[in-house]
């Protein structure tokens, strides 16, 4: 598990940039114009075996002890070159040593260069036996990469393993600019361990020191090393001034952590954000524990709560062991329902409505797999805390294909549902689903005939409170058996478009499906995990109307659809359009009186859906989709976007998204009852844009307008300045952050962020547009 981290002071001094860099275009090319390159043929092999060539105006010697070269002295060996006004070579016999000690003194305008570094100074010294080297009062400049500095004394030791600087400095800024630099009384760089030790380290902006540490051990190279990361700051209306100072801890080869003290002025305390990553035989995972010891704002707003501590715990794990065992964890829990309203966090959002806590262990071999899992939900609504958890759930699949012309499958599930409230129904559900398929296909079409049996048993408990308040009663023991029959046929027709577009190919792909499921009254079964599934074009051909198993709607229907695609001469899809409908011969029912459209007794063409994509050119693209459901008496959902994209930094995108309140209520019934902001549905039009506005300046913006509420939904604006040695990013974001029940409108949070990045320490010379686009609450999605 390898990690490269740009530390706060890391990779200072020449040694920081010995790793090869890949350079982005434009700005990177401009920056490299100020960096010297190695223009001599690169020599491979052991330099000790290569000849030494010396040129000078004058030479004299006392063989074999001394030799003096003066006047434009130029010494070359392999890739190394030494120039000076005067060079003195000394050779002395050392007692007990088979070889004499050979040293060199260089005086006046000393210039040393190779394929990695250039050293300049008035005086230099070297031991030719050990390769130890000293340069006094020197400047250094990296070759082929950014990085330069000064030192009172620069020393090479341990066969060039160690570089030691006395009163040294480093910056990645080009000559003539010292916007930032790092200085230290002593700096030791170990190339083998890829670490730099700094004593009395000072980070300076211009001539002003802004950070001091008596000792720092910083990573240099690919090996992971502990150290401070680049700090960050922002201002929000929720927390006022915020400051982050992350620290990276390299614990072991298979685990590391990032510890971030996060100061929030309005909260009056520091939140400790701790991220831990690990790799084991059972898989890889990540844990996050955020802890705020006390929150004065929360304490004022919730005076009846015993504690004002705020916390989040997140655990994600995925792994395979012995090729047959699967382990997965997706666990998020917070201290209170308001947590994601008050704090930004990449592991959750205030718009989610709930947090999931799921553990699963699976076993899989050929033709068989089984999974045991538990799933719980933490609902963020303070008004409705009722939610069901699966404790536990067993899923089993057995496959046997090519049984003659048939494919077979048996799916089984056993689950126990528990509610967070002690007066709600609970149940144990056992489900068995044998399936047999007859797939037939050739080059131009396919038909799949499927028959299955849906057999489910419920053992429901804790029914007294519910039955006493509802006219429809739940039964303790319920058996439901339903056959299902489906025939799904597809064809693909293809033609050349020589008359209209030479080299282009068009396909026509009709599809038809018949589905039959008999009606079973399910009013005596409580709805534990079912909700309406979205009916986009591909969803029209599902065998189910609802997710889960508690509501299986009857069906006597034909679904028809057609897709047409156009490919260019390089087989790239340039255009597609899909349109489909479901025609009901009889009403689709479950017997649940809470599903309002079942009382309408509707048949005929009830559900329509369409999707389209048009890659107009290499820079223009369009996507759209719409779903109409007559059972909801409305367009259920729709979305559209058109985009101009010149490259990753230059793009403009227009969007529209819509979801009817009836659709939200049908698909998210429990969340809809408490999510006041969605009672009128979603109807938003917006734009996203990114463009360099001047040399080294780029701007990103996003704006969405709620046409239902006639007000701004959310917006974002970011500006970044990029240079060869630093980048500064300033951003503003306004986003919804909860609902005010008293005033009946959304609550918004305004955030201003500020970030500085040191350049020249990595291959990133980008304008920052992609990072700013992804930071929005509704992140940019590519249309092309």
Swiss-Prot record:
The keyword ATP-binding does not apply. It comes from the Bacteria. GO terms for biological process: Gram-negative-bacterium-type cell outer membrane assembly; lipopolysaccharide transport. Coiled coil: none annotated. Residues 1-24 form the signal peptide. One of its GO terms (cellular component) is transporter complex. It is found in: Cell outer membrane. Contains two intramolecular disulfide bonds. Keywords: Cell outer membrane, Disulfide bond, Membrane, Signal. Disulfide bonds join 31-724, 173-725. Together with LptE, is involved in the assembly of lipopolysaccharide (LPS) at the surface of the outer membrane. Belongs to the LptD family. NCBIfam families: PRK03761.1 (NF002997). This is LPS-assembly protein LptD. It comes from Shigella dysenteriae serotype 1 (strain Sd197). The gene is lptD.
